[in-house]
Design a protein with these regions (language model features):
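Active-site and donor-binding regions of nucleotide-sugar-utilizing enzymes
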Residues: 1-214
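C-terminal amphipathic helix plus adjacent low-complexity
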Residues: 1-15, 348-405
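Conserved catalytic-core segment of nucleotide-activated headgroup transferases in glycan assembly
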Residues: 61, 207-277
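Catalytic donor nucleotide-activated moiety binding site of glycosyltransferases and closely related
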Residues: 105-110, 145-148, 255-287, 330
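Short acidic active-site motifs
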Residues: 128, 173-174, 289-293, 350
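Catalytic binding pocket for nucleotide-activated donors in carbohydrate/polymer assembly enzymes
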Residues: 182, 203-204, 208, 307-378
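Donor nucleotide-activated moiety binding/catalytic core segment of transferases
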Residues: 266-310, 314-315, 319, 326
Length: 405
């Protein structure tokens, strides 16, 4: 959690001051020149590179759709390819911050002070987005993220302005997510629906469509009977020291295997020291290489809490769950171990035993473990989730009245 909100109050204050200078004040002087018309369009709202890749197929299939992000939002390699919503006026709403923080303190106690930096970031999104919706009057908004502060604010603003909303699941969900609150939700499989039902009342229509972003790759399942190439996918919650220790163990114990480290695209740490320490270690740049392209070059995946486990199993890549460190934020966060998708190792020797087993024999039907997570797996619509999602979205849009001008 320290990567998201520093434990030190002084560091949190420094983060707030940096946000105020670079984002709030910086946005005032940063021009916005959108290449596409936002008025009356179907907005595909993205908050990350992964979101962009999850929704881009809709942009290609629906001519009336445009990809949209908040001003200054980092979308990785697609920063220049999305339209931007101005956040210049966000600065005007910070007079509310003391009252909001005090109100949260009364309901949430000390947690409000612990995360005062995150509360600070969220101020003003709702009001700015209400103005934007009233100005542009989009036909509908399609989300790929349902829990970031700006995405939640846009969803609430859409409800207030009567703009229809849809949601396309882009990664695995957990029971810690907000309740499903869109007019149309296109989920990947029964796992997601079961978890959202535990989050609270499910609003609107729900359809299970499989995993659209995997369509192109499902026909390229890994049929290798043994493990020779191993990928390690890490994110900001994984501790650098633990990752280094794991690599030291694996490279020493398995000199015949090829190991590739893939940090999350949002991970800003410098892992150059690993290249110098272990010249045989390969790297995958998540900002440049699609996750399925990465997995297509692996026979096994080692990772902690990431939906890359599911994507691996869909391609018949062995999935090994191993936590890099002792942080208490998540433990089998997505339930992959509990539902038999991934096999777990609690220690490096246990991880070594699992890897040796798969080194000797990797089953060719591992992908069947993912049926609970992907509704189209093993059906005639396997590999056609994009077509199914676009068809359902188009029918839903056609059934809704056009906004009055």
């Amino acid at each position: 959690m320290a990567k998201i909100s520093p434990a030190s109050p002084l560091r949190r204050l420094a983060k707030v001051l940096g946000y105020a200078a670079l984002r709030l004040v910086g946005n005032v002087f940063r021009p916005i020149r959108n290449p596409e018309q936002l008025q009356g369009a179907v907005w595909l709202y993205v908050v990350s590179q992964n979101n962009y890749e999850a929704l881009h197929f809709i942009r290609e299939a629906l001519p009336s759709s445009v990809l949209v992000a908040g001003q200054s939002k980092q979308i990785g390699r697609y920063n220049q390819q999305v339209n931007r919503l101005s956040l210049r006026r966000k600065l005007l709403y910070y007079w509310q911050y003391p009252a909001v923080l005090w109100a949260l303190h009364k309901t949430e106690g000390q947690r409000a002070w612990r995360f005062f930096d995150l509360v600070f970031n969220a101020i003003g999104y709702y009001e700015v987005y209400v103005r934007a919706l009233r100005h542009y009057q989009p036909r509908a908004i399609v989300f790929a993220n349902d829990h970031n502060d700006d995405a939640r604010a846009l969803l609430l603003a859409a409800r207030a302005c009567g703009v229809p909303t849809a949601y396309v699941q882009h990664a695995s969900v957990s029971t810690n997510f907000p309740p499903l609150g869109f007019d149309l939700s296109l989920l990947e499989g029964q796992d997601a629906l079961d978890k959202y039902r535990q989050c609270g009342p499910v609003h609107g229509r729900v359809e299970l469509v499989g995993m659209p972003k995997a369509d192109t790759f499902l026909a390229q399942k890994n049929r290798s009977p043994e493990v020779r190439r191993v990928g390690l996918a890490i994110n900001t919650l994984d501790e650098t020291e633990a990752v280094t220790a794991a690599l030291h163990y694996l490279l020493r114990e398995f000199p015949a295997l090829t190991f590739t480290l893939r940090p999350h695209p949002g991970d800003g740490r410098d892992f150059g020291f690993l290249t110098r320490q272990y010249p045989e270690l390969q790297f995958s740049d998540a900002r440049q290489q699609n996750v399925f392209e990465f997995l297509g070059q692996q026979d096994a995946l080692i990772a902690a809490d990431t939906s890359t486990h599911l994507e691996a199993v869909l391609l018949n890549v062995a999935s090994l769950y191993f936590r890099f460190g002792t942080h208490g934020v998540a433990d089998d966060y997505y339930g992959y171990v509990a539902h038999g998708l991934s096999e777990r190792a609690y220690s490096l020797p246990e991880l070594g035993e699992l890897l040796r087993r798969y080194q000797e024999h990797k089953p060719t039907d591992l992908y069947r473990r993912a049926a609970y997570y992907n509704a189209t797996l093993g059906t005639p619509e396997e590999g056609h989730s994009q077509q199914r999602a676009v068809r359902l979205l188009a029918e839903w849009l056609d059934s809704r009245p056009l906004p009055a001008r």
